[in-house]
C-alpha cells in the first residue's frame, strides 16, 4: 500500500500538542478532520513524534495510507488540497508518495530540536510565542561547557518525565550547540531520539548552570543519578521547535545538508 508522506510546519500556540486529546484541539485532529472532509471518513495520520502543547514544528514528518480517491493520486494535488483546507498556523511544506515500508516514527534515525532564548524582557510581539526570557544574564560559555557532558550515548532517565512507557532511556546526542546571536540564543539539540520532555529538561539544566545554581560538570552527577527527581525543572514549551527529522536512504526526501545520513547510521 502506498503511503502519503507529508512534511509540515505548524505554530503550536493554539494546540494541545500533536496527539488527539479528548477535550482539546490537536494538530493531528485538525489534519485528520481535513482529510475526512474529502474522503468522508477518518484517516489515521501518524507523525515522527508527539510534540507537546505549544511546541512548534518547522520540519515535522507524518504519513497516512493513500485513500482510493482521485484527489489523492498525485503528491502536488494532495499538498494543494490540504493547504486549502488547513488553518493558517498549519502548513504542508511538501508531499511525497512512499511505500508501505516507510514509517514516519520508526524509520527516523535522527531528530533536531531548537530552543530559543531571548535576552529582551520586552521581546518583539511575535517573538513572545517562540522565545523564552529566563530573567537572568545568559552565560553561554558556561552553558556550552555543560552541554559537552551530555554528548554521546547516555542513560537520560534524569531528563525524562514520567508519562511514557520506555523500553530504554538510553539515547545518543550527536550535537548540543549554544548559538549566541546577541539578542537571542538558540540551543540546537540533535540526537537519535528523545524521551518525553527531554529537550526541555536539558535546556532547564543549562539555564541552571547559566544562573550559577551549579557548575557545568554537575551535569555528570545528574546523569549518574538516573532519577528524574534529581533533574532540573523543564524549560517552558512555547520556545521549542521540532526542526528536522532525518531518514536513511531511500527515505531521505526531506533531509537537509545538516542530516549526514551515512554518519548518523554509523553512530546509531
Swiss-Prot record:
GO terms for molecular function: RNA binding; tRNA pseudouridine(38-40) synthase activity. It is an enzyme of class 5 (isomerase). Homodimer. Substrate binds at residue 113. This is tRNA pseudouridine synthase A. InterPro entries: PsdUridine_synth_cat_dom_sf, PsdUridine_synth_TruA, PsdUridine_synth_TruA_a/b_dom, PsdUridine_synth_TruA_C, TruA/RsuA/RluB/E/F_N. Pfam families: PseudoU_synth_1. The active site is at residue 52. Formation of pseudouridine at positions 38, 39 and 40 in the anticodon stem and loop of transfer RNAs. It catalyses: uridine(38/39/40) in tRNA = pseudouridine(38/39/40) in tRNA. Its EC number is 5.4.99.12. Belongs to the tRNA pseudouridine synthase TruA family. Keywords: Isomerase, tRNA processing. SUPFAM superfamilies: Pseudouridine synthase (SSF55120). GO terms for biological process: tRNA pseudouridine synthesis.
